[in-house]
């Protein structure tokens, strides 16, 4: 040991770290707005709207609601004035060119990401991680959704998309094209407060954001049975009756398509994702898994490249357990447990720089079907003699 004379201080870096759930409701919307102020919404660039309706209005400087973004974003804001990111793309000479611009890609000369691909730059530009994704007015196009879903998988985001068509059969046919657990499909379109048709996904996205930011609900709750604002009705009549498995709303839900019903106001109606694995059939369960996994991976950044010592293992496990316990207390899970399995962490694996942590969890069940049974009895007839 080198010679020292005096008092020398140091800081012990061991110990449990807090785990915090980041914003679960930050959305990115890709779309067109040819009359937008280009100084505020430059084409191909992610732009943050921090709950500012005045900035949102600059998507439509001419006031004619041209493009897919103005009405779509207005319907989102009818549900919740929120921080949200918009990526404006140029309209093409025809629909095919517009769709190509929306799908985007990487400019081979500049390396600039464009269209849907630019979603990957959102966190670097805005400082906020995307959690919810959609494409205004074009999510019913198979090519667009095919490009969007891999981005959602990479970022662990939920996708809001619409079914095309004017019939139940057309909507279901589109649904059959997909088997992704992070996808929720909607049908039909909604008539907004100006009696203009707007994709249902706009209203659903706004409801999801509003629900996520309400401490009584949060990311583990379903948007189903939530009233929507700024709407006059649906493009086509969607009949609904409690207990009727043959009404259109039930048939849509049975095919994992969320709709809107009239039941003391217009309400979102449907809980299910498009997952091909029944384990992930509920949208809320997918979101709990994604949000908790993100909380843990973000919360363990301090542990990267540390020496794997006993205190390291203890601190990592306890930090994660504390984070899980916090989400349980908040009502987002029934229970959860973290552990380090010695069998997965043999000496040769640790020396090679690997450490494996496991955790389990149980998300809340969703009361999708409430069963009420009546019992006819004579037992109370003797009340006439009391």
Segments predicted by a language model, with ranges:
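Acidic/glycine-enriched edge-of-secondary-structure segments
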Residues: 80-115
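A glycine- and small-residue-enriched flexible loop/hinge signal that marks low-structured segments
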Residues: 2-53, 77, 107-298, 337, ...
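N-terminal assembly/attachment segments of tailed bacteriophage virion structural proteins
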Residues: 42-91
